[in-house]
C-alpha cells in the first residue's frame, strides 16, 4: 500500500519529525494542527485558521472536509469550549464527524486550540 506524506508550513514539522498529514490507501490522518501564525487571534479565529490549514492538507492528499470522520480538539482553557465548538460547527455542522474536545496545555502559550482530523475517502471500486 502506498504512503503519501503531506508537508505543511509549520516550523515544528522538521524539529519534531512529523508530517502535516499522512495518506495510506483511502485513509488520511492529519496531525495535531495549531494556529501557527495566528497567535494573537481569538479562540474562534484560531479555530477557523486551524481548520483552513487542515482543509489544505486534506486537499493535498486528495480529500476534502466532507471525508472527515473524526476530529480531536485540544483546548487550552475550558471557558473557550463554546467559542471553539461553534467555529468547529460552522465547518462540520452538516458533516458531523465523531469529535472529542480535551483540555490540554499547548506547545505555544498563545495557542488556544489544536485540532487533529481523520478522513476516509470512498473506495475507488
Which residues does each PLM region occupy?
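N-terminal presequence-like segments and the immediate start of the first folded domain
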Residues: 1-69, 75-125
Amino acid at each position: 500500500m502506498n504512503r503519501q506524506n503531506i508537508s505543511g508550513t509549520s516550523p515544528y514539522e522538521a524539529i519534531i519529525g512529523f508530517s502535516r498529514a499522512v495518506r495510506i490507501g483511502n485513509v488520511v490522518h492529519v496531525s495535531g494542527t495549531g494556529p501557527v501564525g495566528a497567535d494573537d487571534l481569538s479562540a474562534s479565529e484560531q479555530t477557523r485558521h486551524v481548520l483552513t490549514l487542515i482543509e489544505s492538507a486534506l486537499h493535498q492528499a486528495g480529500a476534502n472536509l466532507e471525508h472527515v470522520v473524526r476530529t480531536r480538539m485540544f483546548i487550552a482553557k475550558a471557558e473557550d469550549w463554546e467559542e471553539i465548538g461553534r467555529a468547529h460547527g460552522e465547518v462540520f455542522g452538516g458533516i458531523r464527524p465523531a469529535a472529542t474536545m480535551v483540555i490540554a496545555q499547548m506547545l505555544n502559550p498563545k495557542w488556544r486550540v489544536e485540532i487533529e482530523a481523520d478522513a476516509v475517502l470512498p473506495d475507488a471500486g
